């Protein structure tokens, strides 16, 4: 736990702040806004190694832009050995995104975020499958999700003509005898996390207590005798070195977070290793194609392939322009960041984490096979994969785009030696003076609850005060409420956030129906605690 007070007179050679944020992406900016709302007098600094914020994973071109709420992503609803569909993870993810919607709604109402359609747009989410077994699974999934108010309004169809009305490009040219099925959820969203980041940081820059340092790379992290942290960084343009002392240090540096946590020397970082996986997409900007597809259509991984291989045909709105992406196709580089170093993987390997990495390499051999196969894909192979979703696609309309890097978490495990984890993980010191975020999807979509989880663990005493409680509930009206158990609250907040964010209105919810699905853990802390039955990699935010 950390109790912050303003520093006294600053030493000339060392800047002193209450909070230092390393990394200029969606996570650091979200935490910065949280803390400024709760403690507007605290001094705060953000350090970013590139010459602008939101240029790595948060950049709209470096991720799939899905507002992850488990409406279409089939890997969140596995079929158990007894044939039943487990929706607990889907409920957890959806509850987390509802917190995010509420957080953004508050920021729109207070003027921190402006013009909602610049960063979020209604885009139906759909699952699309073919083959008898997959059609059967999707029908069972749809029926299981009806137990939760979070998924009311979802439609299921195995009728060629009905699906054609939803996604004509995906059905034209398809054999009508092929068994297909789809679910359709109109309340899905496409999100430009880069735009949100830029607006958040722009707001923070307007506050006198906030400082932004760009083109600044952290080179050293040491603990001071008084328990604070001294962070040394170098301006990559001038070569000047600067030290800053901080009472609380947050490392939201994406793929660079692990090495910085290791540099701090905290023992909690020793249990983790990382494995980088990149992603590429086929892109079209042809208006004749783009204007006839409005959906994020997720498929199902092929037999024997890991969930990360799930392809999707996505409508995107990036910087005001509508496009379509198809992918992802896995790529490999030893870089942990798109703008990183080829030595990143080797530099993060230590005597503490090398064995967990080797164990994962053996236990997750299907993933290794999948990555090897992806690296062998030709342009023709990728185009043929697209045609499974868009039968009449034309090569000349599409180009290949290299998106961002995702660093998958490998954690030491006493039973297995090491496990590959899906999702995000907060790693913090015992005294709570330093914390960092590792992992990937659903990441950005649940930035608000993940950062609220940081506040719950690092600033536990502060969060218990009436002042913080009142402010948090002002921003998150359902804080502490399990939405899955409260259909009335789901509908109330759905309506409020849809109106503020200029999104499609939600479906009516039958308040007499009591959900039978297992409730998720409180959304605020759930994201970093997620434990899927069989975790594997995910290369899209």
Curated annotation (Swiss-Prot):
**Source superkingdom:** Bacteria
Q: What protein is this chain from?
A: Probable malate:quinone oxidoreductase
Keyword entries, A-Z: FAD, Flavoprotein, Oxidoreductase, Plasmid, Tricarboxylic acid cycle
* SUPFAM superfamilies reported in the protein's UniProt record: FAD/NAD(P)-binding domain
Q: Tell me any Pfam family this protein matches.
A: Mqo
GO molecular function per UniProt: 2-hydroxyglutarate dehydrogenase activity; L-malate dehydrogenase (quinone) activity
* Reactions the enzyme catalyzes: (S)-malate + a quinone = a quinol + oxaloacetate
Q: In which pathway does it act?
A: Carbohydrate metabolism; tricarboxylic acid cycle; oxaloacetate from (S)-malate (quinone route): step 1/1
Family stated for the protein in its record: Belongs to the MQO family.
Q: Where is the signal peptide?
A: none
- The record's EC number reads 1.1.5.4
- UniProt cofactor(s): FAD
- In the UniProt record, does the keyword rRNA-binding occur? no
Q: Please give the organism.
A: Ralstonia nicotianae (strain ATCC BAA-1114 / GMI1000) (Ralstonia solanacearum)
